[in-house]
Amino acid sequence: MKILLSGFIFILPELAFAHAGQRGHVMLLPTNLYIGGGAAVVALTFIFMIIVAGKSAIGKNIKLNQPEVQIKPVSWLSFLSLTAMFILILIGFKGNSDPMQNLLPLTTWVVWWIGLTMATAIFGNLWNFISPWPALGKLISFFPGIYLSSKLGVFSLGKLAYWPAVILFFLYAWLELVHPSPMDPDTLARIIFIYLIITASAMLIFGSKQWLNTCEPFTVFFRMVAWLSPIYLKSAKVENNTESSRISIRMPCSGLLRSELLPLSGTAFVLLVLSTVSFDGLSRTFWWLSLNGINPLEFPGKTVMVLPNTLGLCATFFVFATAYYLTHVISYFLNPYLKPSGSFIYSLIPIAFGYHFAHYLPAFLVDIQYALIAFSDPFSLGWNLFGTSGWTVSASFLSHFDSVIMIWFLQISAIVLAHVAAVIVAYLLQLHDSPNGQNSILVQVPATLLMIGYTIFGLWLLSTPVAV
């Protein structure tokens, strides 16, 4: 086996830096063993929950909706973040045309999208601390004749709920996964500037609180990822009976134990996040390219794949939504006297993050080095502000046996543990709705089978050859 493992590191394809999400290597490990093992772990987790939770009073003692305080933005950090956004847009227009030397694409795709998401799952909703949108709202209100209410705008969103976030996140995913040059500094600067105008207009029309709560996709996204974090702000009453908050520790993913149900649009948003990161991996596989008549060994570039990838992105979301719907239908068929918990969608959030971590990890380890170098000379004027301009990017760890194995095991662990967490969360939520436990077992079987199947799919994505 060691000979097999040693052999594949010599045929690793060169890491492609044209897109922050590309995987740096193809793993040719004995995949049947690892895929089967990962699926077995998820299945055994479900059995364990039946044995332990079903025979105890845990169902009656599950605490939903922990007294969590929504993190409020820090004004000076918000203004600093907005200023940084304007500077980055300027860098996109005036800086180096090479995406790997321009701070805008590196900050957007590597530091913010990959890095901040990972940090949020550990430390909580950092985005709320640094979000530029509150500062943008205050800036708008300074203009004569404009009054921006934090609660109400000119119009009410009514029943739109999360649908604007769904549409905007789909456009963002299309830019990342389908657009021929998502890292082009000039293109990215224009798109971010347009999005800034859209956000400002929406806050003016609908009110900043209303828009940011359910419609601004990244505020929604980071809030959901923060539910995975063991760190949160806990509300507490002080001596004079006033509300206060303090940093507290909880079990990872316990923030997902919530009684309020997401509306259909909120469910669609979670499924969209999950389907986009899945299609990101699928779209580079030899299987997908061959399906579209493309020779994977002579990959012509993303331009010829714009239409197939657009259709594929939509189809992946449709498949995920259909699978989610059928899971509920089958669960109800198996036990018509007990409807499956509508909060099941919360259990899919760990899976979305697990795929995010596993999918982006190799590229992040390399591309973050480019970002650190670019920070020292953002305008390509020969500066060395932080002493990193002379650094050399190292990707040699992607061809070293020990480091490659470590990366692959981290990816496997992320996917398997994400599904384990999903099974536990789904079971606890269902058990809360049916504390007697036994009647809820049948309802959980379709969801567990879905997660086992998705575990197999995710590990296959990690192991199958891809075109870079």
Where are these regions (language model features)?
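Hydrophobic alpha-helical membrane-insertion segments
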Residues: 116-121, 267-281, 348-372, 451-455
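Interfacial loop-to-transmembrane junctions
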Residues: 419, 423-451
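Long, well-ordered mid-to-C-terminal structural blocks that present hydrophobic/aromatic surfaces
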Residues: 283-374
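Hydrophobic alpha-helical transmembrane segments and adjacent short intramembrane/lumenal linkers
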Residues: 348-356, 360-417, 426-427, 435
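Membrane-helix interface motif
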Residues: 14-21, 90-97, 278-295, 364-381, ...
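Juxtamembrane boundary at the C-terminal end of a transmembrane helix
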Residues: 456-468
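Membrane-interface segments at the starts/ends of alpha-helical transmembrane spans
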Residues: 21-37, 100-110, 185, 254-259, ...
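Transmembrane-helix bundle segments that line or gate the permeation/cavity pathway
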Residues: 2-4, 14-251, 279-280
